């Protein structure tokens, strides 16, 4: 995959064939295999990641993404340290404020201060260090290596936090040249505040993805994923995120209608929201790499010209194994 690197994230909908899916991800050249964390909607994150570790030998593995709200930090540190040992040092921890995992429980998203504390605490715990929190001493005695932490970020303040504290960033604000510039500037501000540079961070860009013989068919299968992006990336504020004023109310209407229990489920109610509120084309341009192979190549080249180089794409499609093979031969090989 010369010129660009790709990771892929899966929804653990079935465990029976998950190992084969992971083997194919590695065999087709992906550099990162992520698993979504949504305990009420999909199978358990770390069970799926254990399968992935046992069925692969090269590819990076980890949650894309977990959160500090539904799992105690010591539990997460123990889980990711165990995965790191099992996989021979291939684990990476994707961390965010929470989405369907928290909303299906009625829990609040992590605050910026909570994310900052989580990054600091998880880094220490996975290094095997003792940490004092809330009058207690926490430690993961079998942890041996500081597992790299990647912060999933959409807003300027979270992007700055990533630049200041994280090992890497998973940018979820979009893929247009304007949004890429805005995001990189925020990450760089945070990096400078910590005496670092943008080059010190491993930056990845999240893309809702599909390939088909026609652009319309590709988009149709990922409308639930586009709705999820609108619901998540703009949930706290639309300010400072490069969204035209006339789109604010349609986005808020979509968010009011969004059902966390149907998060990322094809054919469920959320899939109809992008058309219902007239947002499909905006969301495709903003968040997607989707269409024919030529469409996808053009979208990636546009993003690369703006400064993006590494992309986490979604395998939220009817046949992810066929999708990966086609992606490798008809998109990645062309770049």
List each model region and its residues.
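N-terminal beta1-alpha1-beta2 module of alpha/beta enzyme domains
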Residues: 1-64, 147
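Conserved, mostly hydrophobic/aromatic
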Residues: 29, 52, 83, 122, ...
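Alpha-helix-loop-beta-strand connector modules within alpha/beta enzyme cores
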Residues: 46-66, 70, 125, 193, ...
